Amino acid sequence: QEDGTPDIETSKLLSDTFALSSNFAANLMLRQIGGGGVGAEWQGALKMTETLRGLGLQNTFMTTPYDTERQTQTMVTPANSDKTWDTEPDGYRQTTAKDIGLVLEWIVQCSQGGGTLLAAFPGQLTPNECQQTLDYIALDRNRILLETGVPPDTRYAHKHGFVSTAHGDVGVFWSPAGPYIVSLFIYKPGWMEWELSSSIMADVSKAAWDYFTLVANGGQPPDVDTPLPDPAAPITATAPITPAAP
């Protein structure tokens, strides 16, 4: 559209993709990106991959649309070439916590009138369109994973996803100190329990929120080289204890 506003059909697809995690809607979006014809979702996946790689994201690709039996060759990346850890990634759709976190960071920066996307696509993208993208991402509201680590009235936009062995979530949260991004993928061989990933993500999210809230209030976070206290050490009072009244 001339004013950058998605038409009704595209808006519905975006809403279903983010709010409902609909693979069907995501495939139709890929079809639009690929040109709009039947089967163009394959070209859309390739175009998306080429665009992201052109922005420097070498660990992100999509060679096959969702829920399809037809398969293509996988892509070799720096991440999947590192055999230190085997997280059983999907052979046809991959990213990393860093890559997806950068994409969200770029969208936020674009919505504020600066950053990588506006520089890379001059005249093709506007801050308003990037804000609309954040609004669609913000439709993912379930109070799970990273969401549970921040106060309920916090402004945020996040997108989660999961398979049997891995759970992931990436979000931008507006703290008193400004927006910050948390991107976290957790893998466990065999089966990733929801209770485990939920607890870890809630703790990480709360720690990030507490850190930026402390900074906003003028507090000094501990130096990264400060040793943690010995949990076995005896507890000593740091302030006088008022005697109980007789």
List PLM regions with ranges.
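Active-site SXXK
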Residues: 1-2, 17, 100, 182
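Short intrinsically disordered, low-complexity coil segments enriched in acidic
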Residues: 1-5, 211
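Active-site-adjacent helix/loop patches that line small-molecule binding or acyl-intermediate pockets
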Residues: 5-88, 94-98, 106
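Structured C-terminal helix/loop/strand segments within mature extracytoplasmic catalytic/sensor domains
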Residues: 34, 92-97, 101-246
